[in-house]
Amino acid sequence: MEDKRQRARVQGGWATPTKSQSATQPASPARSRLSQTAGPAWRSKEQQQCDRQFVFKEPQLVVRAAPEPRVIDREGVYEISLSPTGVSRVCLYPGFVDLKEADWILEQLCKDVPWKQRMGIREDVTYPQPRLTAWYGELPYTYSRITMEPNPHWLPVLWTLKSRIEENTSHTFNSLLCNFYRDEKDSVDWHSDDEPSLGSCPVIASLSFGATRTFEMRKKPPPEENGDYTYVERVKIPLDHGTLLIMEGATQADWQHRVPKEYHSRQPRVNLTFRTVYPDPRGAPR
């Protein structure tokens, strides 16, 4: 009987460690590492990757903004662009004709120039041009499918203005296109003075009389824009009574211009655009 109790105590000693043994026995290294893992070691790599958290980030959008128009309203020479075609340059001379003389000239032009409203053609549809025009020069001039017949009978005041511009700019001209904007509803749409008869880099001298109107320019877009003018450079030039504007260099090749309609009432305005027309486009300067 004593032997059975002794064997039971011995067997119990193997089954349950004493408190002192439990306190001093170090934990198994393998079990410590296992308890620190995120999951059982037998899980596949694919299952462990599914437990990862991914943070979604919005893609950064490239926002294109149309550039603000450049305003030119002071006397000076301005190079507005440089391209393989060349330098595009405008020269602004406010007060080229003083106010008193400009008033007299405006009165003479409104009265004596043979103004006429011509029919334009756009996409095979004819429409009355929203302005009056007249042509002076020994050669005809064709633009926008409209042909202006030769008119060598220059008014003395027009010949005097042509000579004055030539003396002050060192440019020469043999023709003149006159535009009469009767009110704020008259305008001219986007275009370039790039007809073959003018040569590749024509010089255009624009002299204004009467109400101030805004002369707007926009650069022609590169080929990758597919004719979209949304993001091109733009220029605005207020043309006052007696102001002279010269466009030269690659301006007609690289830029378009217009005089838009106005929202507010405008008094009459006359614009004289002097240019050189060549009888044979093959002989025009390139």
From Swiss-Prot:
Chain positions with (4R)-5-oxoleucine modification: L177
Pfam families for the chain: 2OG-FeII_Oxy_2 (PF13532)
Annotated catalysed reactions: an N(1)-methyladenosine in mRNA + 2-oxoglutarate + O2 = an adenosine in mRNA + formaldehyde + succinate + CO2; a methylated nucleobase within DNA + 2-oxoglutarate + O2 = a nucleobase within DNA + formaldehyde + succinate + CO2; an N(1)-methyl-2'-deoxyadenosine in single-stranded DNA + 2-oxoglutarate + O2 = a 2'-deoxyadenosine in single-stranded DNA + formaldehyde + succinate + CO2 + H(+); an N(3)-methyl-2'-deoxycytidine in single-stranded DNA + 2-oxoglutarate + O2 = a 2'-deoxycytidine in single-stranded DNA + formaldehyde + succinate + CO2 + H(+)
Broad class of the protein's primary localization: nucleus
EC number: 1.14.11.33, 1.14.11.54
Regulation: Activated by ascorbate.
Post-translational modification: Ubiquitinated; undergoes 'Lys-48'-linked polyubiquitination. OTUD4 promotes USP7 and USP9X-dependent deubiquitination of 'Lys-48'-polyubiquitinated ALKBH3 promoting the repair of alkylated DNA lesions.
Compositionally biased spans, kind Polar residues: 17-38
Modified residues ((4R)-5-hydroxyleucine): L177
Entry annotated with the keyword Acetylation: no
Entry comment describing in which tissues the protein is expressed: Detected in testis, kidney, liver and heart.
Cofactor(s) required, per the database record: Fe(2+)
Broad class of enzyme this protein falls into: oxidoreductase
Binding site for substrate: W115, Y141, T142, Y143, D194
Span of domain Fe2OG dioxygenase: 172-278
Residues binding 2-oxoglutarate, per UniProt: N179, F180, Y181, R269, V270, N271, L272, T273, F274, R275
Family statement: Belongs to the alkB family.
PANTHER family the record matches: ALPHA-KETOGLUTARATE-DEPENDENT DIOXYGENASE ALKB HOMOLOG 3
Function text: Dioxygenase that mediates demethylation of DNA and RNA containing 1-methyladenosine (m1A). Repairs alkylated DNA containing 1-methyladenosine (m1A) and 3-methylcytosine (m3C) by oxidative demethylation. Has a strong preference for single-stranded DNA. Able to process alkylated m3C within double-stranded regions via its interaction with ASCC3, which promotes DNA unwinding to generate single-stranded substrate needed for ALKBH3. Can repair exocyclic 3,N4-ethenocytosine adducs in single-stranded DNA. Also acts on RNA.
Protein name as it appears in the record: Alpha-ketoglutarate-dependent dioxygenase alkB homolog 3
Organism listed in the record: Mus musculus
Protein's gene: Alkbh3
